[in-house]
Curated annotation (Swiss-Prot):
The gene is gcvH. The lineage of its organism: Bacteria, Pseudomonadati, Pseudomonadota, Betaproteobacteria, Burkholderiales. Pfam families: GCV_H (PF01597). GO terms for cellular component: cytosol; glycine cleavage complex. Binds 1 lipoyl cofactor covalently. The glycine cleavage system is composed of four proteins: P, T, L and H. NCBIfam families: gcvH (TIGR00527), PRK01202.1 (NF002270). Belongs to the GcvH family. Residues 24-105 form the Lipoyl-binding domain. This is Glycine cleavage system H protein. The glycine cleavage system catalyzes the degradation of glycine. The H protein shuttles the methylamine group of glycine from the P protein to the T protein.
Length: 127
């Protein structure tokens, strides 16, 4: 069974979301997603300063099996992308919850509350 930390929020499209002390959100892909993708070989992450809408495809993860879009879990502004993950995409396979992909300053902080809990994500994902 995949690792699904209870302190995070999740999307049905397999992104995890961590709310930081300053209200910004750190986003990555779930352990289940990296397992299904297999060896990740390339990441295309959004530019800092980009305005994104909830549900918009804003990044790409490529593995030896497939390329998958990563979606914005909330609307807001991209305030950081993880250059370390871009340089070492395999880090996402090694620890999906440490190798974050990008950070968003949400337009509406309450949007996070509509995301899935760990239990809800596991139920929907069949994890």
């Amino acid at each position: 069974m995949s690792n699904t930390p209870v302190e995070l929020k999740y999307t049905e499209s397999h992104e995890w979301v961590r709310t930081e002390a300053d209200g910004t959100l750190t986003i990555g892909i779930t352990d289940l997603a990296q397992e299904q993708l297999g060896d990740i070989v390339f990441l295309e992450l959004p530019d800092t300063g980009r305005q994104v809408k909830q549900g918009e495809a804003i990044a790409v993860v490529e593995s030896v099996k497939a390329a998958s879009d990563i979606y914005a879990p909330v609307s807001g502004e991209v305030i950081a992308s993880n250059a370390d993950a871009t340089e070492s995409p395999e880090s996402v396979n090694e620890d999906a919850y440490d190798a974050w992909l990008f950070k968003i300053k949400p337009a509406n902080a309450d949007d996070v509350n509509a995301l899935l809990s760990a239990d809800q994500y596991q139920a929907k994902a069949g994890a």
